[in-house]
């Protein structure tokens, strides 16, 4: 891979709140390419639509997420595939389409095999209150799909509902998209999580190259203007800024690979998993996590909500912030959870524990921040109305 992108530091425009965005050479640097109190749509949504599907990402975009979050793996024929689990068993009909292969890893299937899977019916079965017949037949997505949806497009389909694509003599796939007639103008960024990258050698380089190919690598080609705002009026505009992507992983080798490939010039977050009880109360544990995040050039740490004695305490949040880092927390489902992480802080009610929320309920989180006057707009429609606008009727 040839990395020719230049990242030019420049003074950035004032935010809606009046706080200045600093240049790459100033205190905070790349960290300031993300808005404070960012709403990050976890897998699009896992509540209102089948996770990581076109329906989930279109809904998150139109609901006003600042970022849509995805999980990326790789098919047998080297196509980047959007899937969280190590297998297709939980979210698709793989047991029906490919009997005996339910426990096979994602990387053992070709892209064409993957495109035959139904990624919607399992959601309907598990979530009868949110089930919609039209979700049946939702596809497992490829990497490019999510970015085109973020641009206001949708997958182009044949009359039978199958997606339009071609495959050239070299085996390379070419996917087609069209303007989404239900697009409402929000332009979110994309939060990219590599899953089990140790099992996919060169995954970080492939992500870099694919981002460059589809016009989403902020280090290649035309660099977004320093003055480009996070919002334009009441429309999200993060997807057109220098903070248009964030890369993250739980893998420590993967984090070091991100540092090598992206050169600490894009947003990055070091994910930490579920702690044992009171583990994050141990200074040696939290100090080491913070030290590694800084070593790999990640200005963000991502941690989970945890239970009463786990997760992000005021003390841990204080240490992260004192080290010059920020923390985004996953994954919110209720207003009560949001209140816990927004209200308390390091001894001050005005200092939230979480700098951003990775949420399964973008609708709730957008309105939560709006009600607390840290976001200029709330949702315009109910989640059900948004789904109907997008063509996902009952």
Can you say where each PLM-predicted feature lies in the sequence?
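Bacterial N-terminal signal peptides
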Residues: 9-17
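Bacterial N-terminal signal peptides that target proteins for export
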Residues: 1-7
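Phosphate-group recognition and catalysis centered on beta-loop-alpha active-site segments
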Residues: 19-394
């Amino acid at each position: 891979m040839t990395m020719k992108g230049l990242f030019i530091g420049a003074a950035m425009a004032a935010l809606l709140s009046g706080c200045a965005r600093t240049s790459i050479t100033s205190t905070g640097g790349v960290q300031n390419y993300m808005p404070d109190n960012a709403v990050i749509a976890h897998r699009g949504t896992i509540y209102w639509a089948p996770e990581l599907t076109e329906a989930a990402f279109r809904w998150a975009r139109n609901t006003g997420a600042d970022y849509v979050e995805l999980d990326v793996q790789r098919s047998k024929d080297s196509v980047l595939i959007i899937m969280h689990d190590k297998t297709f068993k939980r979210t698709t009909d793989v047991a029906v389409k490919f009997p005996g292969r339910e426990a096979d890893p994602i990387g053992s299937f070709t892209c064409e095999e993957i495109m035959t899977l139904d990624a919607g019916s399992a959601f309907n079965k598990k979530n009868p209150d949110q089930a919609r017949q039209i979700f049946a037949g939702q596809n497992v997505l490829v990497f490019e799909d999510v970015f085109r949806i973020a641009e206001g497009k949708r997958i182009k389909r044949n009359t039978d509902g199958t997606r339009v694509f071609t495959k050239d003599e070299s085996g390379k796939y070419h996917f087609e998209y069209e303007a989404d007639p239900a697009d409402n103008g929000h332009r979110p960024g994309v939060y990219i999580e590599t899953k089990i990258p140790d099992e996919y050698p060169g995954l970080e380089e492939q992500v870099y190259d694919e981002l460059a190919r589809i016009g989403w690598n902020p280090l290649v080609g035309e660099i977004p203007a320093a003055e480009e705002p996070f919002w334009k009026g009441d429309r999200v505009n993060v997807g057109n800024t220098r903070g248009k992507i964030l890369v993250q992983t739980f893998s420590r080798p993967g984090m070091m690979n991100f540092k090598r490939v992206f050169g600490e010039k894009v947003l990055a977050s070091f994910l930490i998993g579920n702690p044992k009880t009171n583990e994050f109360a141990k200074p040696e544990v939290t100090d080491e996590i913070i030290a590694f995040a800084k070593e790999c050039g990640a200005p963000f740490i991502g941690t989970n909500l945890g239970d009463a004695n786990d997760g992000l305490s005021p003390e841990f949040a204080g240490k992260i912030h004192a080290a010059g880092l920020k923390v985004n927390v996953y994954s919110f489902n209720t207003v009560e959870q949001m209140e816990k992480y927004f209200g308390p802080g390091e001894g001050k009610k005005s200092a939230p524990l979480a700098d951003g929320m990775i949420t399964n309920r973008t609708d709730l989180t957008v309105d939560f921040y709006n009600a607390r006057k840290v976001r200029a707009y709330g949702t315009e429609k109910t989640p059900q109305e948004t789904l109907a606008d997008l063509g996902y009727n009952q």
